[in-house]
Amino acid sequence: MSALTVGTATVSTSLVAGTNTYPNNQGNDNDVLTTNGSGTLTWSAPAGGGGGKETIVNSSSAISGTLNLDFESAQIYHYTANAGGNWTVNFRGSSSVTLNNTMDTNQSLTFVLYSQQGSTAYYNNGWQIDGSGKTPKWLGGFGTPNSGHTNSVDVYTYTIMKIGNNDFRIYANQNFYT
């Protein structure tokens, strides 16, 4: 049977066609249709990746010690005070949710960390996911950075891939702005 075009249909309740249930309104600007996996479609705001805008954490604190980077808060962290010492980054979902429970297997995410440096430069020298130590692979083949860059803004980019349950890979890069 070929497709049948009827024209415009006005539906005052949800439309059921076959096994699919469609919403009875047009949604809001920029909404997308989502499914519950059982054939019911609803309008919702797009999740992640859409729109080309990212939320940042902009902090006037000095980085040192252990720095928790929470995916549920932001993926871009901007620290404007001079770093106060070398630091460890701990990637997690939030203070109450692990990154392991936030990500599915075969998903990736990227964090970016901007660290202001003064006349004494410090650097990221430890890495954790959900409090467990990890060793990143570093871009460029030069190994793990062993210093920061004085009077600059160091930028660290970390791409995290979840390979399996509590099985992650971190691919990292350090660069700087003067």
Regions from the language model: what does each represent?
Residues G49-H78:
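Extracellular beta-solenoid/beta-roll
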Residues F168-I170:
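Short, Lys/Arg-rich amphipathic alpha-helical interaction segments
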Residues M1-G50, F71-S73, T80-W87, F91-T110, ...:
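Extracellular repetitive beta-rich solenoid segments
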